[in-house]
Amino acid sequence: MKKLLVFMMAISLFAGCVTDKDDEVMGKDLKIAVTVGDEQTIYPSLLLGIGLTTAQSDEEFDVFDVVFKSKVKGNVKILFEATKLNFETIVTQSGCEEGQVISPRIKWDYDQLAAVRSPGLVDFTVICYVDNIECDRHNLRVNYRSVNECVYIAINQETDEVYDFTWMFGAYVNENHTKIDPFLQKIISNGIVTNFVGYQRDDETVMDQVFSIWHELQTRGVTYSNVVMTSNPSNGVGSQYVRFFDEVLDNTQANCVDGTVFFSSILRKIGIEPILILIPGHMYLGYYDVSGASYFLLETTKIGGLNLKEITSGNAVQILRQYIDVWITQQEYDAFVKGQITLNDMKNGISYRSFLDATDCNVDSHISNSEKFGNVLMYRFLPVQELRQIVQPIENATTKSAKTYSSELFKDLGKVKGKARKSLQR
């Protein structure tokens, strides 16, 4: 049974000086000393994402270990008092052996963990009882991080073993978010698509649905924001700041991970299966075609390359002139100036061309990296449908059933679709 030491807080229980002939400690003489592991940090995102999930059958994610340093008879009880992050937790057993380890499953307050948006400190009080007599108590001050900090890699400081947590990005994909339905209704009202049908038709319809999301975000003026670093001083844990669905929508800002999990949330909602594609320092989106054997790519950071919100009837002639030979031709621009093409059609057209560019731009590098996915650290191909077997949306962590991780997941990449169409005609 492996233990992730970088997340473990060790609580050592040791004996007083009074012993009997069997080297047992009298219950009243059992004392506790509290020591904290290297990290001394709680990551709410990790606790929420795996709250009801066993990530691997040979790994545990308990935060605390209790180690008994002496043999004791009687009924032993370890009590963790309630804090702002957890409910009172009690572990009991009959006697203890020297060196015995127990791992209390703390009763976390998942609603409070989900509300943690900035780092802080929390004091745990741990009390030891033998036969209902308090023997000792200690306070443990622990750091906690923002729920926006996604842990994606950890290193055991004692063994240098690396733990891959990239699947935790799936916890930020939330297909059940309450703001998705109003967002989809707004798209339909704009007329880019008349409804969302998932895979019920053909690949053209699938792409049109994805484009309608792209177009709406450009209409809202969503920009690229390279906010990825956190204030986490850890040398043993790699984490990245990830915005939730409502934060991207309300703040109209997204980095590569934000945009990818945002799109993935909507695609899952409308019945299109997304893929989180991770390479060192970057993430981009994939989504399956109707057959389920091939997939398209999408570079979500390119959304911010075109701000449709800033193009108005008053400045369109000036702004669109800058797009000649980039998103429009000279002939199309001249036709617009003459009133032969409407402003709405021009905006839809340049948005679609930017969408096709974002569809194409990663194809060649993706194919060249295909053998690295799943075999080289930080190259990961993560279908969200399969991620749901090991991690749930953070806001829904307490309502899902536990699943078991399969090491065979994420092996078959399938076939990436080739170059996209380049015409304004759709």
Task: Label every model-predicted segment.
Residues 10-11:
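Short, linear, compositionally biased motifs with a strong N-terminal bias
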Residues 20-426:
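A structural boundary/capping signal
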Residues 14-16:
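C-terminal motif of bacterial Sec signal peptides marking the signal peptidase cleavage site
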Residues 2-7:
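Sec-dependent signal peptide recognition
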